[in-house]
From Swiss-Prot:
PANTHER family in the record: RIBOSOMAL RNA LARGE SUBUNIT METHYLTRANSFERASE M, RIBOSOMAL RNA METHYLTRANSFERASE FTSJ DOMAIN-CONTAINING PROTEIN
EC annotation from Swiss-Prot or TrEMBL: 2.1.1.186
GO biological process terms on file: methylation; rRNA processing
Keywords per UniProt: Cytoplasm, Methyltransferase, rRNA processing, S-adenosyl-L-methionine, Transferase
Name this protein carries in UniProt: Ribosomal RNA large subunit methyltransferase M
Length: 366
């Protein structure tokens, strides 16, 4: 199995292809990407037969920016007979996967695939039963075993394969299913909520998103991102010349600071979180984020970088490299992750967690 399917946002196939080609090449896993515009997926075909599995096991999925999900697959199954689609799929998976822990029958995230999605939902139940009968799936779902993927690209046409549960997206189609809260001031609130689900392990939420923490929201108006912090019982400094939603001010947890997010400097030294969703050039936002992290003004940050029309992967890579260089230069040890989220549009979301100062004798306790 030498092909890897990567699901992505429709319209960002070229960026997804450029990224996987670059990062696979750095691990000496060579191949080429098959790209179809607005298809919502990319196929990276490795030159060596076993390199597909090697790629999805060795390259951390969390290091990918434009992929929502990935899995290794074999050849395309075509012209599945409508009276029995199950037998050929079972045949393709037998001997390839043993005791998979979960089945996901998926499609790309496009308008054309919506009808196909209805079929996938109905088809999952009988296919799961058949795969359990032959030992491709365990009798009960388990997160400790590989995930079996059946990916339909058209009626009667699908790829079959698997991903590793410790190195994939835990979400169906790589998309967390979030509901817009009716009392939130703007739909942008879903961007931050999704970022928290993607970047922070669930078992660390109580510690890293704790009641009573102090947070700063730069460019906060009208308060979509502030809403998420307030919901987690944090005290929030919302920085923006524009007004905040009255519903947030009424909580008593929000201090509205009417000033420019680029000029604001915090006057406390116990800020756990800084979040930022400002419409500005990526380089300017990245420089501001580097300043906050280098000075220890916050422990963790989530921010958005708005993308240009062309060379979007190169632009993101350049800004992340600049941020890493600034942290290295000032002896700050940090984890950096970036992802184009489902609720992002022409942008990517970046999460940085400051761990400790790497300089001997210094420890970051702020």
């Amino acid at each position: 199995m030498n092909k890897v399917v990567l699901l992505c946002r429709p319209g960002f196939e070229k960026e997804c292809a450029a990224e996987i080609t670059d990062k696979a090449g750095k691990r000496e896993i060579f191949g080429f990407a098959r790209v179809k515009e607005n298809a919502g997926y990319v196929i990276y075909e490795c030159y060596q037969p076993e390199d597909g599995e090697k790629l999805i096991s060795e390259l951390p999925f969390s290091s990918l920016i434009f992929a929502r999900q990935w899995f290794v697959v074999g050849e395309l199954l075509q012209h599945l007979p409508p009276e029995d689609r199950i037998t050929p799929i079972v045949g393709m998976l037998q001997g390839v996967v043993e005791k998979g822990g979960e089945l996901r029958v998926e499609v790309a995230d496009t308008n054309e695939s919506k009808e196909l999605m209805k079929f996938c939902r109905k088809f999952t139940v009988p296919l799961r039963a058949a795969l359990r009968d032959v030992g491709v799936l365990t009798n009960y779902e388990t997160p400790k075993r590989p995930v079996v993927h059946v990916f339909f690209i058209a009626p009667g046409c699908c790829y079959t394969g698997y991903s590793f549960a410790h190195n994939n997206s835990p979400f169906y189609m790589g998309i967390p299913r979030l509901k817009f809260p009716s009392d939130a001031p703007s739909r942008s609130t879903l961007k931050l909520e999704e970022a928290l689900h993607v970047f922070i392990p669930e078992d660390e939420w109580d510690e890293r998103l704790a009641n009573g923490m102090y947070a700063v929201d730069l460019g906060a108006c009208p308060g979509g991102w502030t809403y998420q912090l307030v919901k987690r019982n944090m005290w929030v400094y919302s920085v923006d010349n524009g007004p905040m939603a009255q519903s947030l001010m009424d909580t008593g947890q929000v201090t509205w600071l009417r000033e420019d997010g680029f000029r604001y400097r915090p006057n406390r030294n116990n800020i756990s979180w800084m979040v930022c969703d400002m419409v500005e050039k990526p380089a300017k936002v990245t420089a501001l984020m580097a300043q906050w992290l280098v000075n220890g003004w916050c422990r963790e940050t989530i921010f958005n970088l708005k993308l240009p029309m062309k060379k979007r992967y190169e632009e993101v890579s350049h800004n992340l490299a600049y941020l890493q260089a600034q942290l290295d230069e000032h002896g700050v040890n940090a984890q950096i992750q970036a992802r184009q989220l489902y609720h992002d549009r022409e942008e990517v979301t970046v999460h940085v967690r400051r761990l400790w100062a790497a300089v001997g004798g210094r420890r970051d306790e702020r």
